[in-house]
Structures are given as structure tokens and as C-alpha cells.
Amino acid sequence: MNVPDFEKLAKLAHSNDIPLIVDNTLGAAGAIIKPIDYGADVVVHSATKWIGGHGTSIGGIIIDAGTFNWGNGKFPLFTEPSEGYHGLVHWDVSGFESDLCKALGIPSDKNIAFGIRARFEVLRDYGAALSPFNSFLFIQGLETLSLRVERHSEN
């Protein structure tokens, strides 16, 4: 498997004020590589393939490093009022050093804007939430993740 130079890609993306978003499906849900450690801003995983491991549930995971400045002027969905939330401006509420971040103990160099917007708007509009049973199945799959990754890596 060829692993991209995430640090170089992150530097290029950040020099242009855009986030580095990585599909880490082949990274075995972070068991093989953790792109955030190399500068990725957002990482997505297929929970179906590695976390579940048995094809019994369909799901995915979005992980936000909390490091990207979504308020840099290039992402109006974060910096302009949201009609669906009575004019809420996501960046004002959940950007660096926002009252919400302070209340939650988020370090001043981190933000939760991407995660908050995903929960507030995407979850509301598309309903992408796991059922309790599917969550249980994924937790069961996690119990054998390290063994499965070890065996796949040996093969």
C-alpha cells in the first residue's frame, strides 16, 4: 500500500486556507495510521469495513481535529447566519475561543465548529444516526479490531 505524504499535503492545503480531509478507510480506523497526527484536519472512516468487520451494519465516522480555521472567509456555511437555526452563525458559537469552547474546556488553539455544524445541520437534514443495535454491533467489532488488523497486516 502506498501511503501519501500527509504532512506535505497538509502544508499545501493549509497554505491555501483549505482543510485536508482524509478518507482513512484503508488505515483500519486509525489502527494502521492516524492522519491527524500528520496534519489532517478531518478524517473519515468506514465503520462498516474495519470497526464492525463483519458486514452486519453500515456506518461511518467523521473525526475533526479541531485545528482548522473555518472562519477564514472561504466557508460561508460557517460564517454566515444559518436560516435553519434562526440566524445562528456556527463560527461565532463554536470557533476558536468561543464561549461554548471555553465552557467545554476546549483549548484555545482548537475549535468544534465542524462537529457542531455536522450535528446541527447534517444530522438534522439527513438523519445519519446509528440505531442503538448497530452501535452495539460496532462495539462488538472493536473488540477484535487489533487482532484483525494484525492478521491482515501479516497476510
What are the residue ranges of the model-derived segments?
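Conserved PLP-enzyme active-site core in the AAT-like
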Residues: 1-155
